[in-house]
């Protein structure tokens, strides 16, 4: 189907008037401001606990009030939480953490790291924080956003991942040693998401640094997966990156595959890439034809389309949010409501849910405080204003606080049936879960900007428009400003093209009573606003790591020329025009 892609200046398809309340069980509507403050308190309880008990380890162990390294040795929770600090309005702590990361994070270490997790959490987190630095009052260097310490750190981390892509197929290994490259005995079997979840971060990095290698390897990996789809249009779960042969042939939208589909859509919007969107739409047809049953999505055999697992996985709950990005709101809401019934049954989403039996799957009863259903609620609420979506936000706050809160943060729920806890607080709780909850209850947050305000930044390559909205969240909820990808282009013609699009967009707004408020800022040193940090217990000095710490075993992935316009409301249009 022919279509046009529009750079979104709102988060999702169409921003309708928002409802500011949702009926609760007693008939009252939850107050967004009330829940916003409770979410903020949740963040600081977890964040302070990490700083006091776990930094500089990757993650907090909330039951024993200590830390451990998990996905590398990067102070991962601090990187993952950085942009959340700004979204919550804490510029002073953001500034302090930027300094701490520069002084303490080193990627020249003999560590086997997940290529997927390092990209989405470390590279994505550093890129997002880099692009938000000026807004947070950080004194940026001349040439920003095309240069800066966080950008250099992101580039260094990404270069450590490049050896993983040196395979006959161009599809990356799942694990790489940050000092030595791919280990000789490394398994060549990688999950689909571990291959197809790089285009957002790597294309951003190439655009900002001028080095095309990152975007190039990400595109090759995407295309190899596309070429490996079955005759009925489906992809499997795990593939051998040396031979290109599928090892696990289960096809679905959940664990091991999920963010591949997500990045086709988000990559298409971020890069205005018609081909990526066309690829997703073809997949979407096959997914609906073979895996979609009664607004659930099952797992099927990729070559035959026969059902292999009639289960719902909690990671699949991102799908309604993704559907909203392509304008498929009706289907998105129906599927969301199915998933919400599971939440209400258990007070969270179990990792696996047997749909015919209506109950959890053995050994998959846990809920590690995942964000996916809350993420979809945030997107859909921006698109529809349906009060049911606020109800989910309210229920999530109440459940997490009641079940998971402990003295040192929030603990993973090991079993939703009896609410037993596990001694882990994953970094995505601060990067994603809390962030999406806060944005659900904060419709006026700068992340939701619809283009009514923006900044004009002078770079060595000309004027650059930033902060107008349309942020693209990577799969770890790190927001990327799509306009930034046009700030550092070496070809002046590309800059003129962007400026023409900006002028055309704002000419559409001249008839509106409220004109765009524009402030001009120039790159270079400036004095940030002073003020006390709101953080009660900053960790200015990292604690020394103990050599006896046990690490969690590594996993490879988690269980132009075409019409281009700036959209007033932000939308991917699918039509015949």
Swiss-Prot record:
Glycosylated residues (UniProt): 90, 112, 289, 450
Record-linked SUPFAM superfamilies: Seven-hairpin glycosidases
Its biological purpose: Involved in the endoplasmic reticulum-associated degradation (ERAD) pathway that targets misfolded glycoproteins for degradation in an N-glycan-dependent manner. May initiate ERAD by promoting the first mannose trimming step of ERAD substrates, from Man9GlcNAc2 to Man8GlcNAc2. Seems to recognize and bind to exposed hydrophobic regions in target proteins.
Gene Ontology biological process: carbohydrate metabolic process; endoplasmic reticulum mannose trimming; ERAD pathway; mannoprotein catabolic process; positive regulation of retrograde protein transport, ER to cytosol; response to unfolded protein
Record protein name field: ER degradation-enhancing alpha-mannosidase-like protein 2
Molecular function, one GO term: calcium ion binding
Subcellular location: Endoplasmic reticulum lumen
Single GO cellular component term: endoplasmic reticulum quality control compartment
Keyword Endoplasmic reticulum among UniProt keywords: yes
Organism from which the protein derives: Mus musculus (Mouse)
Induction, per UniProt: Up-regulated by the unfolded protein response (UPR) via the XBP1 transcription factor.
Signal sequence coordinates: 1-21
Gene: Edem2
Principal localisation: endoplasmic reticulum
InterPro entries: 6hp_glycosidase-like_sf, EDEM1/2/3, Glyco_hydro_47, Seven-hairpin_glycosidases
């Amino acid at each position: 189907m022919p279509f046009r892609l529009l750079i979104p200046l709102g988060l999702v398809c169409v921003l309708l008037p928002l409802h500011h309340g949702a009926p609760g069980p007693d008939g009252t509507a939850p107050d967004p401001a009330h829940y916003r403050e409770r979410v903020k308190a949740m963040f600081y309880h977890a964040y302070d606990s990490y700083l006091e008990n776990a930094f500089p380890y990757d993650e907090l162990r909330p039951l024993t009030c200590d830390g451990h390294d998990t996905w590398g040795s990067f102070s991962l929770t601090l990187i993952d939480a950085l942009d959340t600090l700004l979204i919550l309005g804490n510029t002073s702590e953001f500034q302090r953490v930027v300094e701490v990361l520069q002084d303490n994070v080193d990627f020249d270490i003999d560590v086997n790291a997940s290529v997927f997790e390092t990209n989405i959490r470390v590279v994505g987190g550093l890129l997002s924080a880099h692009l938000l630095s000026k807004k947070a009052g950080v004194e940026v260097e001349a040439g920003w956003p095309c240069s800066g310490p966080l950008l250099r750190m992101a580039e260094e981390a990404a270069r450590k991942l490049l050896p993983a892509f040196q395979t006959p197929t161009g599809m990356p290994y799942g694990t790489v040693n940050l000092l030595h490259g791919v280990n000789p005995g490394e398994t060549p079997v990688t999950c689909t998401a571990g291959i197809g979840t790089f285009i957002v971060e790597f294309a951003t990095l190439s655009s900002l640094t001028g080095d095309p290698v990152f975007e190039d390897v990400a595109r090759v990996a995407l295309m190899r997966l596309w070429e490996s789809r079955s005759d009925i249009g489906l992809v499997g779960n795990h593939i051998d990156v040396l031979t290109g042969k599928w090892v696990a042939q289960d096809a679905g939208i959940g664990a091991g595959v999920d963010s591949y589909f997500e990045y086709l859509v988000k990559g298409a919007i971020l890069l205005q890439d018609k081909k990526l969107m066309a690829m997703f739409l073809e997949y979407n047809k096959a997914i609906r034809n073979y895996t979609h049953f009664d607004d659930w999505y099952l797992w099927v055999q990729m070559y035959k389309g026969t059902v292999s697992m009639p289960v719902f996985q909690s990671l699949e709950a991102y799908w309604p949010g993704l559907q909203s990005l392509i304008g498929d709101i009706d289907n998105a809401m129906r599927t969301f409501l199915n998933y919400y019934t599971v939440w209400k049954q258990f007070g969270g989403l179990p990792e696996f849910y047997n749909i015919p039996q209506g109950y959890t799957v053995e050994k998959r009863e846990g809920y590690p405080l995942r964000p996916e259903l809350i993420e979809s609620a945030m997107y859909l609420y921006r698109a529809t204003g349906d009060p049911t979506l606020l109800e989910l936000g309210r229920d999530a706050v109440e459940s997490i606080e009641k079940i998971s809160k402990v003295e040192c943060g929030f603990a993973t729920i090991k079993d939703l049936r009896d609410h037993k806890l596990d001694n882990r607080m994953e970094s995505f709780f601060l990067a994603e879960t809390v962030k999406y909850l806060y944005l659900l209850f904060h419709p006026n947050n700068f992340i939701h900007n619809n283009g009514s305000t923006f900044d004009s930044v002078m770079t060595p390559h000309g004027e650059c428009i930033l902060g107008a909205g349309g942020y693209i969240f990577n799969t770890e909820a790190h927001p990327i400003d799509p306009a930034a990808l046009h700030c550092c282009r070496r070809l002046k013609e590309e800059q003129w093209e962007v400026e023409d699009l900006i002028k055309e967009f704002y000419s559409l707004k001249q008839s509106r009573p409220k004109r765009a408020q524009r402030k001009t800022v120039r790159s270079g040193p400036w004095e940030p606003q002073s003020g006390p940090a709101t953080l009660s217990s900053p960790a200015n000095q990292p604690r020394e790591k103990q050599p006896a710490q046990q690490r969690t075993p590594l996993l490879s992935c988690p269980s132009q020329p075409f019409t281009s316009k700036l959209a007033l409301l932000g939308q991917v249009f699918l039509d015949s025009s």
